[in-house]
Amino acid sequence: MEIILIKPVRKLGKIGDILKVADGFGRNYLLPQKLAIRATEPNKELIVKQKHEFEAKDKQIREEVEKINALIKEQKLVFIRQTSDDGKLFGSITNKEIADKLSENVSYNIFHSNIILDKKIKSTGIYTVEIRLHAELNAIVTVIVARSESEVQDYLREQKNESLETLAESA
């Protein structure tokens, strides 16, 4: 299937690119998500005319996302949860919970589908989580899972000491 991208798609292309993709990928993902349109002759002509408009809109979105990124990258999300004696959570922390807490902290809607989490967080500790804000921009946040506030402070002190040791070794 031949398609024209109307939004940038990670690892695929940018606005206005004409690509051949698998039929299922085009029909089941790109077209319904309004990331692309079919590459017919009228659509090709239309895209040439509207390419600047799409690029301007994407630039505006990217600027907005960069503002959000500036707010997000300094965030440390703290989850206080009950655990067993060996530090395993009763339950887990999912990408939805991370998105909700992050949205609450930065006053922007972050969707759980934007949180890149290989597997659910099931034990205490410090985790780095990637957030996909735009096709070309990801942010990293720190997630701290602990039993109590004092344990959170211990984790933060440990992390600070490790970063100081790393600086001392590199100097």
Curated annotation (Swiss-Prot):
Keyword Ribosomal protein belongs to the record: yes
Keyword Ribonucleoprotein among record annotations: yes
SUPFAM superfamilies membership: L9 N-domain-like (SSF55658), Ribosomal protein L9 C-domain (SSF55653)
Cited InterPro entries: Ribosomal_bL9 (IPR000244), Ribosomal_bL9/RNase_H1_N (IPR009027), Ribosomal_bL9_bac/chp (IPR020594), Ribosomal_bL9_C (IPR020069), Ribosomal_bL9_C_sf (IPR036791), Ribosomal_bL9_N (IPR020070), Ribosomal_bL9_N_sf (IPR036935)
Origin superkingdom: Bacteria
A matching Pfam family: Ribosomal_L9_C
Matches recorded under Gene3D superfamilies: Ribosomal protein L9, C-terminal domain (3.10.430.100), Ribosomal protein L9, N-terminal domain (3.40.5.10)
Gene Ontology terms: cellular component: ribonucleoprotein complex; ribosome
One GO molecular-function entry: structural constituent of ribosome
Keywords: Ribonucleoprotein, Ribosomal protein, RNA-binding, rRNA-binding
GO BP term, example: translation
Family: Belongs to the bacterial ribosomal protein bL9 family.
Entries under NCBIfam families matching the protein: L9
Protein purpose: Binds to the 23S rRNA.
Protein name: Large ribosomal subunit protein bL9
Record organism: Rickettsia canadensis (strain McKiel)
Taxonomy of the source species: Bacteria, Pseudomonadati, Pseudomonadota, Alphaproteobacteria, Rickettsiales
Underlying gene: rplI
